[in-house]
């Protein structure tokens, strides 16, 4: 079947393959201005711990080239700028211009200049040379990508041999009671918060649905192997609500 006739998930709705990117763009154009505030409210601030653990596992050192993909408002990129020093370089990349603009303004105001670039790019066809980055991170972005297999292969292409990919993403809770509470919170509280804070309940309804349609821990692990990564491992956080996958290129 050609891509023109294929459909894909947009939350719980099936949409034409080529339309998902436009619909996801609409979501993030809508939420960009309040993105950081909503992250704190929705996760009770725990997203900062998840990201801190990701940074600690990244192995980033002075002089490294780092790609923070779907980097949004720059939480990871800001720390990486400090870690690589002026000898290294961080590229904060996002497909969404609104998110990228918020991230650029935020990091510039924090004094993050000189060793960072901002690139609007599609994860499925990254505009970077082969074997270029020491480390790639994608935090809460992979589930919004239309062709995840193609994106993972693109990440593998631009990663140096010996480099590593870290995927921080919502996943499948491993505790049944937690899963029930999480479902109740996701489908009721998130759209309500979205309506109150951003006047946009639908975008946060999509968020809850997109999490449920994202591959589980083992499936994503295999997808990373299939894309060319080796020694893929994952660590569950907060009972599997979030998982950090790490894969290496050799």
From Swiss-Prot:
Pathway: Quinol/quinone metabolism; menaquinone biosynthesis; menaquinol from 1,4-dihydroxy-2-naphthoate: step 2/2; Cofactor biosynthesis; ubiquinone biosynthesis. Its EC number is 2.1.1.163, 2.1.1.201. It catalyses: a 2-demethylmenaquinol + S-adenosyl-L-methionine = a menaquinol + S-adenosyl-L-homocysteine + H(+); a 2-methoxy-6-(all-trans-polyprenyl)benzene-1,4-diol + S-adenosyl-L-methionine = a 5-methoxy-2-methyl-3-(all-trans-polyprenyl)benzene-1,4-diol + S-adenosyl-L-homocysteine + H(+). It comes from the Bacteria. InterPro entries: SAM-dependent_MTases_sf, UbiE/COQ5_MeTrFase, UbiE/COQ5_MeTrFase_CS. It is an enzyme of class 2 (transferase). GO terms for biological process: aerobic respiration; menaquinone biosynthetic process; methylation. One of its GO terms (molecular function) is demethylmenaquinone methyltransferase activity. Methyltransferase required for the conversion of demethylmenaquinol (DMKH2) to menaquinol (MKH2) and the conversion of 2-polyprenyl-6-methoxy-1,4-benzoquinol (DDMQH2) to 2-polyprenyl-3-methyl-6-methoxy-1,4-benzoquinol (DMQH2). Belongs to the class I-like SAM-binding methyltransferase superfamily. MenG/UbiE family. PANTHER family: 2-METHOXY-6-POLYPRENYL-1,4-BENZOQUINOL METHYLASE, MITOCHONDRIAL, METHYLTRANSFERASE. This is Ubiquinone/menaquinone biosynthesis C-methyltransferase UbiE. It comes from Francisella tularensis subsp. mediasiatica (strain FSC147). The gene is ubiE.
